[in-house]
Amino acid sequence: MANAGFSAPVEYFGQGSSTVIGLKSSTESRDYAVKVTATDARGDIVARDLAGVRISPSAVYNVKAGGDLYLELGSVNTVDTDVVVLLGCDIRTSAASAPEVTLSGESIQTDGTASSTVELPAIALSPRHKAQILAGAFTLAGAGCNLTSCSLSARANITRATKSGDTVAHDVSGTEIVVSGTVQQTGATAPTIEAADGWELTTPKSKANPDEGYIEWTFEATKAAASTEPV
């Protein structure tokens, strides 16, 4: 029996021309912004109203070539009738696994344009299936100490002015970039992990001693990213 073929993912975040990442899949996540109910004396629901349809899309990308990824949280892209603002970026790399980038956002007012934006630092990515130090957030040293996973998460906070569930204005602020890593120790000495300039080890290295396994160290480095108002 013939099928309809594979689905075509939707490019919500304007990365179609990127030479570094390529769209793999997307999710729309459509829902109502307002869901209200009224109850009787017993607390049973007797009325319901819904308003303000929004989408909270996300998209997964493969890393198709080496290079720097440049992202601007708060940037806006129009898809059909939906105006989508980019709010989040998550990158996962690990030993013997393909690196993945996930972008996420929310729809805003019809005909909306970018308000404040947050420019993330350049993120160097390799298509190799290995753990990668992301955004140059830290340095690692130590004989027999190997990075086995590294992830990056950056998310901007969106605030809205609304009327009857519909957004009439929005703004973006409050972004932190968090890079987390796991290091496996096979030598006698613990790894040396230091935050790069502009970064801070907000979760110091902490070890786990598994049964029938090597010592593993986990940590997090964080950097604040300021928002810029439109001119």
Residue ranges and their predicted role:
Residues M1-V231:
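Signature of extracytoplasmic/envelope-associated structural regions
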